[in-house]
Design a protein with these regions (language model features):
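Helix-loop junctions on the cytosolic side of multi-pass membrane transporters
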Residues: 2-32
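Hydrophobic alpha-helical transmembrane segments
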Residues: 2-3, 52-56, 120-121, 144-145
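Transmembrane helical elements of multi-pass membrane transporters/channels
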Residues: 4, 9-12, 53-60, 65-70, ...
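Low-complexity, compositionally biased segments
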Residues: 8, 23-25, 43, 87, ...
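Juxtamembrane intracellular "pre-TM" segments in multi-pass secondary transporters
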Residues: 22-56
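C-terminal transmembrane bundle of multi-pass solute transporters/carriers
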Residues: 39, 46, 60, 66, ...
Length: 186
């Protein structure tokens, strides 16, 4: 499994090296880029409403999800009596949903930037609704389906909020904004 993972990363790196396009905006010189500080990133976030909301969405998601993941083990051991298999199925369901969600939302709601960004709110609600139903689930398999569906929303929220930050921030400050984005979550 490690070898497959390694080879996939090497292949990805090879594909990146094949890109011949300059992907930078080239607005600022190198010396001006070096002057961008953490405070500049924070000021940019606070001054732009869209960036502010995109930046805090993962943090709010993290606060609302705090502790839920440890409940998979409790559900598996105490409620469903399925041990490691149950916990593994629940964790796998999250991953499947997080993978399917952004692709499905993009297909269903459109490919334009505005349409993708407008799905962030509904995707959070979808995540919340399906997670709310988990305590009422009679079996591990129903819980697994609820987790897949819930994480379709959670995955879309995560992917599209990151995408929004990438397309709405200038090159010279994007790293600071991304750093703030993830610091609010972790």
């Amino acid at each position: 499994l490690f070898t497959i993972n390694f080879l996939s990363f090497m292949f990805s790196a090879f594909l990146v090296f094949l890109i011949k396009t300059n992907l930078s905006e080239n607005i600022l010189s190198t010396s001006e880029n070096e002057k961008v500080k953490f405070k500049d990133g924070l000021n940019f976030v606070l001054s732009d409403k869209k960036i502010y909301y995109l930046t805090i969405t993962k943090g709010m998601f993290g606060i609302s999800a705090a502790g839920l993941l440890s409940l998979f083990t409790i559900l598996s051991l105490e409620v469903y009596d399925t041990g490691d298999l149950g916990a593994g199925l629940m964790w796998s369901a999250r991953g499947i949903g997080a993978f399917i969600g952004p692709v499905l939302f993009r297909y269903l709601f459109g490919k334009t930037d505005q349409k993708l960004l407008s799905t962030i709110g509904p995707s959070i609600m979808i995540w919340g609704i399906f997670y709310f139903l988990i305590p009422f689930s009679p079996t591990l398999y129903v819980t697994t389906i609820l987790l897949v569906l819930g994480h379709c929303g959670g995955g879309a929220q995560w992917a599209f909020s990151s995408y929004g930050i990438q397309i709405l921030t200038p090159d010279n400050i994007r790293g600071r904004i991304a750093g703030l984005d993830y610091s609010f979550y972790f």
